[in-house]
């Protein structure tokens, strides 16, 4: 599913998004925008609001207050006003995102957020998040530095099964600069999370220090990294198919046959 066509930066318009939702993604019982109030989710929400009469399912938004920033209550109110102006139902949630020992604040917030949202989405609902191509490049680099294989280097898929339905990222083929330009051209307002500027988090360090230096030397690097992630996703799909076939070949009566398994080349056994 990660190799589905992506909405391209040159096609950041409602019609292109509608085609992706209608023809390339599963048909859900409802579309739910994960709306933080930030730039990316604001653009996604407005794009979908323009499409609402033509969507195959009802459109709603969900905002999660992690209670990690002093302005979080104001951000929730901002999201309420935006959704009210667009006449989009908004579900506001508040979670305890305090990290456990050894857990990063970002990981704790992400886990709490998805757990809370999962509680209110029904079967076959689709959660839409606003990650874009620059986020994909950051994810690829983070996985590379962790020594990931092709599964991890696939980075983020356009759509995957999640919580009795799906999680989709319809802007994954769009550059951050295109999203900002679209928002500014339409006079949209959004909130700025100061934690996104802090250099302590690994992703922020990549975003503000590493990737700009890479792009200064190789201007097409972000697009190239996205292509590499797509190649890895294809390779991961093939390896999963191979592993399924190998498992059948080395199994007898639903049990692994050790002799057959050991006869395989090491790389195929590890797979």
Residue ranges and their predicted role:
Residues 2-212:
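Core alpha/beta nucleotide-donor-binding catalytic domains of modification enzymes
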Residues 201-271:
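ATP/NTP-dependent adenylation/nucleotidyl-transfer catalytic domains that generate, transfer
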């Amino acid at each position: 599913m990660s190799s589905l066509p992506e909405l391209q930066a040159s096609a950041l318009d409602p019609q292109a998004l509608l085609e992706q939702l209608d023809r390339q993604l599963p048909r859900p019982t409802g579309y739910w925008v994960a709306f933080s109030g930030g730039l990316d989710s604001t653009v996604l929400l407005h794009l979908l609001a323009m499409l609402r009469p033509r969507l195959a399912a009802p459109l709603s938004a969900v905002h999660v207050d992690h209670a990690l920033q002093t302005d979080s209550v104001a951000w929730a109110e901002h999201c309420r006003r935006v959704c009210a102006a667009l006449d989009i139902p908004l579900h506001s949630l508040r979670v305890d995102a305090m990290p456990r020992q050894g857990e990063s604040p970002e990981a704790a917030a992400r886990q709490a957020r998805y757990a809370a949202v999962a509680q209110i989405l029904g079967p076959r609902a689709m959660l839409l998040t606003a990650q874009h191509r620059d986020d994909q490049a950051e994810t690829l680099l983070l996985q590379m530095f962790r020594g990931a294989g092709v599964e991890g280097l696939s980075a983020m898929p356009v759509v995957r099964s999640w919580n009795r339905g799906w999680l989709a990222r319809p802007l994954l083929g769009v550059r951050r600069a295109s999203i900002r330009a679209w928002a500014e051209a339409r006079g949209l307002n959004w909130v700025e999370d100061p934690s996104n500027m802090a250099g302590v988090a690994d992703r922020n360090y990549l975003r503000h220090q590493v990737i700009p230096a890479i792009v200064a030397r190789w201007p097409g690097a972000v697009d190239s990294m996205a292509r590499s992630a797509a190649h890895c996703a294809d390779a991961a799909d093939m390896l999963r198919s191979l592993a399924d076939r190998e498992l059948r070949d080395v199994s007898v009566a639903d049990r692994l046959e050790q002799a057959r398994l050991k006869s395989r080349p090491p790389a195929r056994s590890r797979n």
